[in-house]
Amino acid sequence: MSYAEFDADVVIDARDCILGRVASQVAERALDGERIAVVNAEQAVITGSEDDIMEVYRKRDEVGSDRGPRYPKRPDRIFKRSVRGMLPYKTTRGREAFENVRIYMGNPYEEAEVLEDTSLDRLSNIKFVSLGEVSENLGANVTW
């Protein structure tokens, strides 16, 4: 499905927003039946020290066999997997909600809203890593 074919009810900008907070609100709204597009996924952030975050993602990448489980490396796919983890994905309702969510690197839409209480400004500490940096360290091809 191309950018033009997805008619989103809501376009959310994830730039400098905390991944988990945005993902939980996206999941909740998708369950309510809204069609949601999230833009600038590569600029969303994960809080914590860079070493700790990268250790978690590297362990995830090393565990398993050639047959799986496989984990995403691209920022948009990491974001989408986070949203999926917050949905009852194995039920019909959850799967339909998941189909109504699109995640984009960059911004193919004219305007986007920023969700309340998801901004990086609310942090008392300054330790965070962007999804783009995580993806680069995992070996993703940098196209953003």
From Swiss-Prot:
Keywords for the protein's UniProt record, in alphabetical order: Ribonucleoprotein, Ribosomal protein
The UniProt entry, under InterPro entries, shows:
Ribosomal_uL13, Ribosomal_uL13_bac-type, Ribosomal_uL13_CS, Ribosomal_uL13_euk/arc, Ribosomal_uL13_sf
Q: Which GO terms describe its biological process?
A: negative regulation of translation; translation
Gene3D superfamilies given in the database record: Ribosomal protein L13 (3.90.1180.10)
Cellular component terms (Gene Ontology): cytosolic large ribosomal subunit
A Pfam family of the record is: Ribosomal_L13
Q: Which domain of life is it from?
A: Archaea
Q: Which family does it belong to?
A: Belongs to the universal ribosomal protein uL13 family.
Function of the molecule: This protein is one of the early assembly proteins of the 50S ribosomal subunit, although it is not seen to bind rRNA by itself. It is important during the early stages of 50S assembly.
- This chain's protein is named Large ribosomal subunit protein uL13
